[in-house]
Amino acid sequence: MLDLLEFYLKNKETFVDDETPATSKGQYLHAKDIFKAKYFLFNIASSVFSRERNRTGLAQLLEPKDIIQGSLGDCYFLSSIASLVEYYPELLSELFMFDINPSGLYVVRLFNDGEWSSIVLDDRFPCVYGKPIFAKPHGNEIWVLLLEKAWAKLHGSYQSIDMGSSMEALIALTGAPCKFYRKEDDDTRKAIQEGFDSGSVVTCSGS
Protein backbone atom coordinates (compact mmCIF):
# COMPACT_ATOMS: atom_id res chain seq x y z
CA MET A 1 0.00 0.00 0.00
CA LEU A 2 2.87 2.35 0.80
CA ASP A 3 4.33 1.77 -2.68
CA LEU A 4 0.99 2.75 -4.19
CA LEU A 5 0.90 5.98 -2.21
CA GLU A 6 4.51 6.80 -3.11
CA PHE A 7 3.70 6.29 -6.81
CA TYR A 8 0.86 8.82 -6.77
CA LEU A 9 2.82 11.31 -4.68
CA LYS A 10 5.91 11.02 -6.87
CA ASN A 11 3.93 11.50 -10.06
CA LYS A 12 1.71 14.18 -8.50
CA GLU A 13 -1.39 12.28 -9.59
CA THR A 14 -4.78 12.03 -7.92
CA PHE A 15 -5.93 8.55 -7.00
CA VAL A 16 -9.30 7.47 -8.41
CA ASP A 17 -10.84 4.24 -7.14
CA ASP A 18 -12.17 2.52 -10.26
CA GLU A 19 -13.85 -0.15 -8.14
CA THR A 20 -16.34 2.41 -6.83
CA PRO A 21 -17.76 4.47 -9.72
CA ALA A 22 -18.52 8.04 -8.72
CA THR A 23 -22.04 8.19 -10.10
CA SER A 24 -25.46 8.12 -8.52
CA LYS A 25 -26.20 4.97 -10.54
CA GLY A 26 -22.96 3.23 -9.53
CA GLN A 27 -22.68 0.35 -7.14
CA TYR A 28 -22.97 2.63 -4.12
CA LEU A 29 -26.68 3.35 -4.55
CA HIS A 30 -30.03 1.80 -5.01
CA ALA A 31 -32.74 4.03 -6.44
CA LYS A 32 -34.50 5.91 -3.66
CA ASP A 33 -36.55 9.09 -3.52
CA ILE A 34 -33.98 11.01 -1.47
CA PHE A 35 -31.29 10.27 -4.03
CA LYS A 36 -32.09 12.48 -7.03
CA ALA A 37 -29.60 11.77 -9.80
CA LYS A 38 -29.60 15.34 -11.08
CA TYR A 39 -28.52 16.62 -7.65
CA PHE A 40 -26.32 13.74 -6.55
CA LEU A 41 -22.57 14.09 -7.17
CA PHE A 42 -19.35 12.64 -5.81
CA ASN A 43 -17.26 15.64 -4.78
CA ILE A 44 -13.61 15.39 -3.83
CA ALA A 45 -12.79 16.37 -0.28
CA SER A 46 -10.87 19.49 -1.27
CA SER A 47 -13.99 20.94 -2.92
CA VAL A 48 -16.12 20.25 0.15
CA PHE A 49 -13.76 21.20 2.96
CA SER A 50 -11.19 23.94 3.30
CA ARG A 51 -7.64 22.71 2.84
CA GLU A 52 -6.17 22.05 6.27
CA ARG A 53 -3.31 19.99 7.50
CA ASN A 54 -4.44 16.78 9.21
CA ARG A 55 -7.91 17.08 7.74
CA THR A 56 -8.50 13.44 8.64
CA GLY A 57 -8.49 14.72 12.22
CA LEU A 58 -6.27 11.86 13.36
CA ALA A 59 -3.53 14.11 14.67
CA GLN A 60 -6.06 15.99 16.75
CA LEU A 61 -8.36 15.08 19.61
CA LEU A 62 -11.16 12.86 18.33
CA GLU A 63 -14.56 13.45 19.91
CA PRO A 64 -18.01 11.87 19.52
CA LYS A 65 -19.39 15.26 18.49
CA ASP A 66 -17.32 14.97 15.29
CA ILE A 67 -19.91 12.44 14.07
CA ILE A 68 -23.16 13.63 12.48
CA GLN A 69 -25.55 11.17 10.86
CA GLY A 70 -26.80 11.97 7.37
CA SER A 71 -29.52 10.60 5.08
CA LEU A 72 -28.69 6.99 5.80
CA GLY A 73 -29.88 4.65 8.54
CA ASP A 74 -26.41 3.63 9.69
CA CYS A 75 -26.66 4.96 13.24
CA TYR A 76 -25.64 1.48 14.46
CA PHE A 77 -22.26 1.99 12.76
CA LEU A 78 -21.82 5.64 13.72
CA SER A 79 -22.75 4.98 17.36
CA SER A 80 -20.15 2.22 17.47
CA ILE A 81 -17.56 4.67 16.18
CA ALA A 82 -18.67 7.21 18.80
CA SER A 83 -18.24 4.66 21.60
CA LEU A 84 -14.71 3.89 20.46
CA VAL A 85 -13.86 7.58 20.20
CA GLU A 86 -15.14 8.10 23.73
CA TYR A 87 -13.09 5.35 25.37
CA TYR A 88 -10.39 4.11 22.99
CA PRO A 89 -9.58 6.74 20.33
CA GLU A 90 -6.16 5.19 19.76
CA LEU A 91 -7.82 2.04 18.39
CA LEU A 92 -9.72 4.12 15.87
CA SER A 93 -6.55 5.90 14.75
CA GLU A 94 -4.93 2.53 14.03
CA LEU A 95 -7.58 1.79 11.39
CA PHE A 96 -6.06 4.43 9.08
CA MET A 97 -2.83 3.64 7.25
CA PHE A 98 -2.29 7.14 5.83
CA ASP A 99 -2.95 10.67 7.01
CA ILE A 100 -4.07 13.54 4.79
CA ASN A 101 -2.20 13.55 1.49
CA PRO A 102 -2.56 15.38 -1.84
CA SER A 103 -3.10 12.17 -3.82
CA GLY A 104 -6.45 11.52 -2.13
CA LEU A 105 -5.49 7.89 -1.46
CA TYR A 106 -6.54 6.35 1.84
CA VAL A 107 -6.56 2.86 3.29
CA VAL A 108 -8.89 1.85 6.11
CA ARG A 109 -8.47 -1.46 7.92
CA LEU A 110 -11.64 -3.34 8.92
CA PHE A 111 -12.01 -6.80 10.41
CA ASN A 112 -13.99 -9.04 8.07
CA ASP A 113 -14.53 -12.81 7.91
CA GLY A 114 -11.97 -13.51 10.61
CA GLU A 115 -9.15 -11.33 9.30
CA TRP A 116 -8.15 -7.71 8.81
CA SER A 117 -8.92 -6.33 5.35
CA SER A 118 -7.37 -3.20 3.84
CA ILE A 119 -10.03 -1.10 2.11
CA VAL A 120 -8.53 1.24 -0.51
CA LEU A 121 -10.44 4.51 -0.96
CA ASP A 122 -10.24 7.77 -2.82
CA ASP A 123 -11.46 11.03 -1.27
CA ARG A 124 -14.65 11.48 -3.28
CA PHE A 125 -17.83 11.59 -1.22
CA PRO A 126 -21.53 11.59 -2.16
CA CYS A 127 -22.82 15.16 -2.02
CA VAL A 128 -25.95 17.16 -2.71
CA TYR A 129 -25.57 20.87 -3.34
CA GLY A 130 -21.87 20.52 -2.50
CA LYS A 131 -22.40 19.03 0.97
CA PRO A 132 -22.05 15.39 2.11
CA ILE A 133 -25.39 13.60 2.02
CA PHE A 134 -24.46 10.74 4.33
CA ALA A 135 -22.19 11.01 7.41
CA LYS A 136 -21.05 14.56 8.08
CA PRO A 137 -18.18 15.96 10.13
CA HIS A 138 -18.48 18.58 12.83
CA GLY A 139 -15.68 20.57 11.20
CA ASN A 140 -13.24 19.88 8.37
CA GLU A 141 -12.35 16.34 9.44
CA ILE A 142 -13.00 13.58 6.92
CA TRP A 143 -12.20 10.58 9.09
CA VAL A 144 -15.88 9.85 9.76
CA LEU A 145 -16.67 9.98 6.03
CA LEU A 146 -13.74 7.67 5.26
CA LEU A 147 -14.88 5.09 7.80
CA GLU A 148 -18.43 5.15 6.47
CA LYS A 149 -17.19 4.89 2.88
CA ALA A 150 -14.97 1.92 3.80
CA TRP A 151 -17.94 0.22 5.49
CA ALA A 152 -20.06 0.84 2.38
CA LYS A 153 -17.38 -0.48 0.04
CA LEU A 154 -16.94 -3.60 2.17
CA HIS A 155 -20.68 -4.29 1.80
CA GLY A 156 -20.97 -3.28 -1.85
CA SER A 157 -22.94 -0.05 -1.55
CA TYR A 158 -24.07 2.71 0.77
CA GLN A 159 -27.59 1.40 0.41
CA SER A 160 -26.56 -1.99 1.80
CA ILE A 161 -25.38 -0.44 5.09
CA ASP A 162 -28.75 1.25 5.64
CA MET A 163 -29.66 -0.49 8.92
CA GLY A 164 -27.51 -3.11 10.56
CA SER A 165 -26.06 -4.49 13.78
CA SER A 166 -23.95 -2.62 16.32
CA MET A 167 -22.30 -5.91 17.22
CA GLU A 168 -21.24 -6.46 13.61
CA ALA A 169 -19.92 -2.89 13.45
CA LEU A 170 -17.89 -3.21 16.66
CA ILE A 171 -16.33 -6.47 15.50
CA ALA A 172 -15.34 -4.82 12.21
CA LEU A 173 -13.84 -1.82 14.01
CA THR A 174 -11.96 -3.72 16.74
CA GLY A 175 -11.54 -7.34 15.69
CA ALA A 176 -12.63 -8.24 19.22
CA PRO A 177 -15.42 -10.64 20.22
CA CYS A 178 -18.74 -9.00 21.09
CA LYS A 179 -21.92 -10.05 22.86
CA PHE A 180 -25.50 -9.06 22.12
CA TYR A 181 -28.23 -8.63 24.73
CA ARG A 182 -31.89 -7.71 24.36
CA LYS A 183 -33.34 -5.24 26.82
CA GLU A 184 -35.93 -7.78 27.96
CA ASP A 185 -33.28 -10.38 28.84
CA ASP A 186 -32.96 -11.00 32.58
CA ASP A 187 -29.19 -10.57 32.62
CA THR A 188 -28.97 -7.46 30.43
CA ARG A 189 -28.65 -4.91 33.24
CA LYS A 190 -25.98 -7.01 34.94
CA ALA A 191 -24.09 -7.50 31.66
CA ILE A 192 -24.09 -3.75 30.97
CA GLN A 193 -22.71 -2.96 34.42
CA GLU A 194 -20.04 -5.65 34.09
CA GLY A 195 -19.12 -4.24 30.71
CA PHE A 196 -18.61 -0.76 32.12
CA ASP A 197 -16.67 -2.11 35.10
CA SER A 198 -14.32 -4.09 32.86
CA GLY A 199 -13.68 -1.21 30.45
CA SER A 200 -15.57 -2.81 27.58
CA VAL A 201 -17.15 -0.74 24.83
CA VAL A 202 -20.92 -0.71 25.30
CA THR A 203 -23.41 0.50 22.70
CA CYS A 204 -27.19 0.57 22.52
CA SER A 205 -29.28 0.53 19.37
CA GLY A 206 -32.97 0.21 18.56
CA SER A 207 -34.90 -1.37 15.74
Question: Language-model segments: what does each one mean?
Answer:
Residues M1-S207:
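Structured alpha-helical subdomains that flank or immediately precede key functional sites
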